[in-house]
Amino acid sequence: MKFKLNLITLALLANTGFAIAADGYGLANANTEKVKMSAWSCKGCVVETGTSGTVGVGVGYNSEEDIRSANAFGTSNEVAGKLDADVTFRGEKGYRASVEAYQLGMDGGRLEVNAGKQGQYNVNVNYRQIATYNSNSALTPYSGVGSDNLTLPDNWVTAGSSSQMPLLMDSLNSLELSLKRERTGLGFDYQGESLWSTHVSYMREEKTGLKKASGGFFNQSMMLAEPVDYTTDSIEAGIKLKGDNWFTALNYNGSIFKNEYNQLNFDSAFNPTFGAQTSGSIALDPDNQSHTVSLMGQYNDSTNVLSARLLTGQMSQDQALVTSGYGYQVPTEALDAKVDLIGLNLKVVSKVTNSLRLSGSYDYNDRDNNTQIEEWTQVSINNVNGKVAYNTPYDNTSQRFKVAADYRITRGMKLDGGYDFRRDERNYQDRETTDENTVWARFRVNSFETWDMWVKGSYGQRDGSEYQASEWTSSETNSLLRKYNLANRDRTQVEARVTHSPIESLTIDFGARYALDDYTDTVIGLTESKDTSYDANISYMITDDLLANAFYNYQIIESEQAGSSNYSTPTWTGFIEDKVDVVGAGISYNNLLENKLRMGLDYTYSDSNSNTQVRQGITGDYGDYFAKVHNINLYAQYQATEKMALRFDYKIENYKDNDAANDIAVNGIWNVVGFGDNSHDYTAQMIMLSMSYKI
């Protein structure tokens, strides 16, 4: 009897009982040497070809008084248009292409195009735009904003204080503090034989705009609009080899950053003081580059997974130094900075039994600053400078070691825990070595049909080598001061989460977290910090067409700090309280008007508040900082035809903040020329009409 092995036969063999497989009759033992697999075909399989998806266009009207609202609405233009698309083309023999666009034409728009042959190669082209708006009400007396040379009016009259400058208020012009980024990328992936594959991608980011800066002469300062015109070119390439239970990959990452401007020149608005200077310069972000090469691999059998990665790289910058206004000889025209990087990651996961899994990892990262040390003469202003100084080549080495166990006690009940160790070694710091030891455990129960809950606790300690005042700052800091990132610390943390679905259409989720950082040996500095947060979420499918959801998040961080006004024991105590409340709700109704209309409403409210009190004999309040924002989005979508849908969105944002750093008049501080009041208090609205068409 002749027996032909076909797809149906294979399916039957694959579902044969374990008893047959155990006796050597499993599918793995089938003799397939004479089977002509190249002649196999699936006559019942139909591969759909052609184009499918949706495309859409939209136009919106933006009524805004404060440009900050563009962060929420995605555009700063009064009238804005957008293009959306999700289109896929499938051809014969595995050829495929896709186009995805989201709000293209607006500040947060993005586009991604892919084309290739499935399982062989793919070409990717992508574009994304990101914008961040700060203020359009900043004021400055300078001309040349956006360039590297800021000048005052020709008839400017200097004075000893900003309030005495006769032409200041009449010379003010408004400017926009915002940053825009455009990213364009190109990538190629190729799958060779079954053993190897390769990829290469390139991305260019162009960042433009204005950001805050300041220039000073002795104790006088002017707020300046720093021009931003950055270009960053990034490239990534790699090759991957793989087998049945292993793979290895070699990758390269490179980044080259260029700044169109290397310095910002500006006039002084004040009477000449130290050095009788009437103009100055500040250095801007220097050109730099970074290159890394990494080798990684993984081995996986039925019991163990071993993975490793080795990385080496270098960061460098050789920008010419800005020497304008510096009256001494410089030891070198450019710093020629170099930082070498080495990284190593090892990890193993072992399945000891069906119920027990063990894991361990080791991470090593070394940052070696090989910049040449030079001797520099400081400009003399007070008793802590005017001396010879040296650039400090900071090095850092970090090691992390983790072990963990994951044990399934019974079905729906699991216990896991572990131990984490971290060591950081630094030079030219108040403390050369810090060690952190942390133990943690978590217990999870999801054996109940409608409940899923877990609780986790951890305790950690940080200590290290002897704390010594740095020779670079010893004359300027209290010997009792302990920097919070280097000081001894005990950390206790507890968190839990409960998810309950009493009925199929209702889900309730609640989580809480508490963390206490106790800086036990600190006399001057941060002595204690508490972080408490909790959140609640509810989602309810009221009917098949009506869905409602709501959430609430709360966090409060309380910190205590001790200080001294006489370089000795504590004379004052500071208390800082930061709170954040976020609440939101949404409702959507589908299948109205004969299953053609969907309507919805989303609302969120956020309130962040910060308050600082200082006690030194009497209690002084620095005043609250707060930011409050309401966001509403009302929308409706109507299915006009089988393929065409119309959508209407109405968005509102009400925002108000109180920040002492922004709430200052241009001449509000005698020795500062500021940007004026840049606090926010506005209500903005946006209407968007859009249409989508199904191809």
Curated annotation (Swiss-Prot):
Which coarse location class applies to the principal site listed for this UniProt protein? membrane
Q: What InterPro entries does this protein's entry cite?
A: Decahaem-assoc_OM_MtrB/PioB, TonB_rcpt_b-brl_sf
Keywords from the named record: Cell outer membrane, Membrane, Signal
Q: How is this protein annotated for GO cellular component?
A: cell outer membrane
Superkingdom of the source species: Bacteria
A Pfam family recorded for this sequence: MtrB_PioB
Q: Does the keyword Membrane apply?
A: yes
Cleavable signal peptide: 1-21
Q: Quote the subcellular location field of this record.
A: Cell outer membrane
- Asked if Zinc is a keyword of the record, the answer is no
NCBIfam families attached to this UniProt entry? OMP_MtrB_PioB
Name listed for the protein in its UniProt record: Outer membrane protein MtrB
What gene codes for this chain? mtrB
